[in-house]
A protein has these predicted regions:
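Exposed, interaction-prone regions of secreted/extracellular proteins
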Residues: 2-321
Length: 321
């Protein structure tokens, strides 16, 4: 039976007053995602160069959101905004993922370049991806590519690239405490930040330095990033009968459920070229949701959480058949 792959994602555009748009070289974000996910899934069969085994397994879920989606507007062709990283606190959940090669995730992106001439990205968060880990637990992950997901790049330590330095936190490790509906909530602070002296891009989990990406593997990120992103995404397969998947995003509940019921990102910050963290205003954020009847998001701000958003959904439901 022929199965068709379908992607659903949430995109939160950060509109710093210089640029608003789509990814360079693409008419809409879904064009990039469609090809990107296909190429990433093809890389799952690559042999591992090195692996670190965690005593409690592996876990992670991911969500997409885009900050500075593009520089396509003709009024802004000669303007550039530079970023040295991203910070956010991401809640951990264990959504239902239906099939082996389907996934649900929450993540942050650091991006430069474009699809046609070579997209360079550094990505990290949590995901559930049975095809990679052999189970349906949420796991901490990292990913990189220096050529639009074509030949270079991989998850975690599955190829040369990311350099692990921590003996306490392993990429691919299971996140064995996760949030429950109306119960305890668990999250973690994730930071990707460029060291101005060495040029290394460091990945930090809470206060632990996990490791780094050397800039030579992502040459377009050697100086800075042009886009920062946070968000959520699922990929699912259909037999063509037209029904939506039961694969969940986030907690499996809609954003309006709020705290203890919906998944969230809070304490959103981007890092400027002085390596100073800046909190974006909710007024400078625009959301793109491909299937709002299946998954949605709500943005807000508070003194305790800074700029934040709730997101997610159950997938198939009476309004999303």
């Amino acid at each position: 039976m022929m199965l068709n792959k379908i992607m659903v994602f949430l995109i939160l555009h950060m509109v710093i007053p210089i640029v608003v748009g789509t990814f360079p070289g693409k008419s809409k974000p879904s064009d990039l995602h469609e090809q990107e996910i296909e190429l990433r899934l093809k890389q799952l069969n690559k042999p591992a160069i090195k692996s670190i085994h965690s005593p409690d397994g592996d876990i992670i879920d991911c969500v997409w959101i885009y900050d500075q989606p593009a520089f396509d507007h003709p009024l802004f062709k000669n303007h550039t905004i530079q970023f040295h990283g991203s910070k956010s606190r991401i809640s951990i959940w264990k959504p239902n993922v239906l099939r082996t090669r389907e996934f649900s995730l929450a993540q942050t992106w650091v991006v430069n370049g474009d699809w046609d001439t070579g997209l360079n990205t550094l990505e990290s968060g949590w995901q559930i991806l049975h095809a990679l880990y052999g189970d349906k637990n949420p796991r901490l992950f990292a990913y990189w590519t220096g050529d639009t997901y074509r030949e270079t790049g991989c998850y975690n330590l599955d190829c040369p690239g990311f350099v692990q330095v921590s003996r306490h936190i392993s990429l691919g490790a299971a996140l064995n405490t996760f949030s429950t509906y109306n119960g305890e909530q668990y999250d973690f602070l994730l930071t990707i930040e460029k060291d101005q002296e060495t040029g290394l891009w460091w990945l930090k989990f809470e206060t632990y330095l996990i490791g780094y990406w050397p800039s030579f593997i992502v040459p377009k990120l050697a100086a800075s990033a042009r886009k920062i992103a946070w968000g959520g995404e699922i990929v699912y397969y259909t037999s063509g009968r037209g029904t939506h998947t039961l694969t969940q995003m986030g907690s499996g509940h809609f954003a309006e459920k709020g705290f203890r019921k919906a998944a969230y990102f809070n304490s959103l910050e981007y890092i400027d070229t002085s390596n100073y963290p800046i909190t974006p205003s909710p007024q400078n954020l625009e959301a793109t949701v491909t299937r709002p009847e299946c998954y949605n998001l709500q943005v807000g701000s508070s003194q305790r959480w800074g700029t934040y958003f709730f997101y997610g959904g159950p997938g198939r439901n009476p309004h999303c058949p």
